[in-house]
Amino acid sequence: MIARIAGHQYRKGLHALERGDLDALLAQFSPDATLTFVGDTPLGADLSSATDVRAWFERFLRLLPDRRFEVQRYQVSGPPWKMQLAAHVVIRSSIDGEPYENQFAHFLTLRWGKVVDDLILEDTQRWAGACERLAAAGLVDASAAPMR
């Protein structure tokens, strides 16, 4: 039962991100949550403050304004005070009018329903190519340094 609730909350967070509702999304995060996006791209990050985590999601929204997520599978384990959620997700968007699709592995640690650690492993080669296209289209954030 707890796994189903966690899966529902996870999808609810992704839907908030699709809508660009960062307040709803970040309400699921603990104030001391960490976020790691592996890679040396504009979304690359190793963050540990609520302000920086919000700034990362703001950059994400600017880079992919019409994003859609499709959860392929997820697994939940552990008690409510140290729950682990792992998901395989496909992301779709468009870049300069052309379709963009990628996939990522998402690992969350939750404490009493709040995200305390967020780790994202995306196909960085595909994402780096997308950033080149975005930069060529004039999006400044697409050539920004990782957020460390």
State the predicted function of each range.
Residues 18, 37, 95:
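Short glycine/serine/threonine-biased micro-segments
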Residues 1-27, 31, 137-148:
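Short, low-complexity N-terminal intrinsically disordered segments enriched in polar/charged residues
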